[in-house]
């Protein structure tokens, strides 16, 4: 067996160093996450091949367990309870992120096109867009 030349070792080392970081496992998004506004807590679970998230707690819910979706742009939906309201749905796995989903924001009553990316063990980045480039990104932290 021939010894491996230093040139081959150097090329392999450079290729490994340049390789993209390993993608977060698809299930890394599952669990309870703290939102940056109104002390919200969203629980993300599997919904078939997709994921969905429901609002399980927040300032409005703590103040009134029967709080309603009063800001919804659809008047007929303003009587829905905020507790357990599905606010994330339809996302599909796409490499290291979840795409093509929708995010409902009960603070302004709008539904936005979304992308979810896991950033290490301590952050979920949720980007919601009216249409590109009119987007906003929030960073959520896991609740352990």
Residue ranges and their predicted role:
Residues 19-25:
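Sec/Tat signal peptide C-region and signal peptidase I cleavage site
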Residues 34-35, 130:
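Non-cytosolic beta-sheet module surface loops
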Residues 108, 113-117, 123-137:
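Short, exposed beta-strand-loop hairpins at the edges of beta-sheets
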Residues 9-17:
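Bacterial N-terminal signal peptides
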Residues 1-10:
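Bacterial N-terminal signal peptides that target proteins for export
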């Amino acid at each position: 067996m021939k010894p491996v030349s230093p040139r081959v070792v150097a090329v392999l080392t450079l290729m490994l160093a340049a390789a993209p970081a390993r993608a977060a496992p698809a299930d890394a998004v599952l669990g309870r996450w703290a939102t940056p506004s109104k002390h919200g807590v969203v629980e993300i679970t599997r919904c078939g091949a997709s994921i969905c998230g429901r609002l399980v707690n927040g300032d409005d819910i703590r103040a009134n367990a029967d709080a309603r979706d009063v800001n919804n742009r659809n008047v007929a939906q303003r009587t829905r309870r905020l507790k357990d309201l599905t606010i994330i749905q339809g996302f599909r796995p796409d490499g290291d992120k979840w795409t093509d989903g929708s995010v409902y924001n009960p603070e302004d009553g709008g539904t936005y096109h979304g992308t979810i990316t896991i950033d290490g063990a301590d952050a979920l980045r949720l980007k919601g867009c009216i249409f590109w480039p009119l987007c906003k990104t929030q960073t959520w932290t896991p609740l352990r």
